[in-house]
């Protein structure tokens, strides 16, 4: 039973995402591009394989969805290496944006406010978005204007550093504002 499953896996699951090369190409005719980029036009697959063998290189299917498929004569090992290297570089350059949260209360002291504001600036310098939430407890929710004033103080403290994605608005018992780093400043 285990052997049977392995055979099915090998048949249906591709081990890599690289294009087909040489004898794996199933088309009868291909649009051939030479090793230096010169176009040879539509050629029989056997002729294309012969040309690749004579050059000591591989025939690689570049665009399988085209009619006929586009194939290029090149060194397949080098092609795979460069593809992996490009993919690795692209992943390295990707920046995952994280949403950090900073919670405030309406009656926050000046020292705590400045500390939290400094921490928000650190998050923004790291390139993260920040969700600033103001939690109301009990009867504090009756004084929403205190929350609005607090958010105005936050905006003044972060002026020039941020782009406001979502202005202060109520969600249940909390007031929320979302800011992200301003690209112009960085």
Curated annotation (Swiss-Prot):
A Pfam cross-reference name: IF3_N
Location(s), subcellular: Cytoplasm
GO CC term, one of those recorded: membrane
Organism domain of life: Bacteria
Annotated GO MF terms: ribosome binding; translation initiation factor activity
InterPro entries attached to this UniProt entry: T_IF-3_C_sf, T_IF-3_N_sf, Translation_initiation_fac3_CS, Translation_initiation_fac_3, Translation_initiation_fac_3_C, Translation_initiation_fac_3_N
Gene Ontology process terms (BP): ribosome disassembly
NCBIfam families the record matches: infC
Protein family: Belongs to the IF-3 family.
Subunit-level organization: Monomer.
Database matches in PANTHER family: TRANSLATION INITIATION FACTOR IF-3, TRANSLATION INITIATION FACTOR IF-3, MITOCHONDRIAL
Function, in words: IF-3 binds to the 30S ribosomal subunit and shifts the equilibrium between 70S ribosomes and their 50S and 30S subunits in favor of the free subunits, thus enhancing the availability of 30S subunits on which protein synthesis initiation begins.
The name this protein goes by in its record: Translation initiation factor IF-3
Organism encoding this protein: Rickettsia conorii (strain ATCC VR-613 / Malish 7)
Gene name tied to this protein: infC
């Amino acid at each position: 039973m285990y052997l049977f499953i392995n055979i099915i896996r090998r048949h249906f699951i591709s081990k890599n995402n690289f294009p087909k090369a040489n004898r794996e190409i199933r088309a009868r005719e291909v649009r051939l591009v030479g090793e230096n980029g010169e176009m040879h036009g539509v050629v029989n697959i056997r002729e294309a394989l012969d040309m690749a063998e004579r050059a000591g290189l591989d025939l690689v299917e570049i665009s399988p969805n085209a009619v006929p498929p586009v194939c290029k004569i090149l060194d397949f090992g080098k092609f795979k290496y460069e593809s992996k290297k490009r993919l690795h570089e692209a992943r390295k350059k990707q920046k995952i944006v994280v949403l950090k949260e900073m919670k405030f209360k309406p009656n926050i002291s000046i020292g705590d406010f400045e500390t939290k504001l400094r921490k928000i600036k650190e998050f923004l310098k790291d390139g993260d978005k920040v969700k600033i939430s103001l939690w109301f407890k009990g009867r504090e929710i009756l004084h929403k204007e205190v929350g609005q004033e607090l958010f105005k103080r936050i905006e003044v403290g972060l002026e020039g550093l941020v782009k406001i994605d979502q202005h202060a608005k109520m969600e249940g018992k909390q007031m929320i504002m979302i800011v992200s780093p301003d690209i112009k400043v960085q």
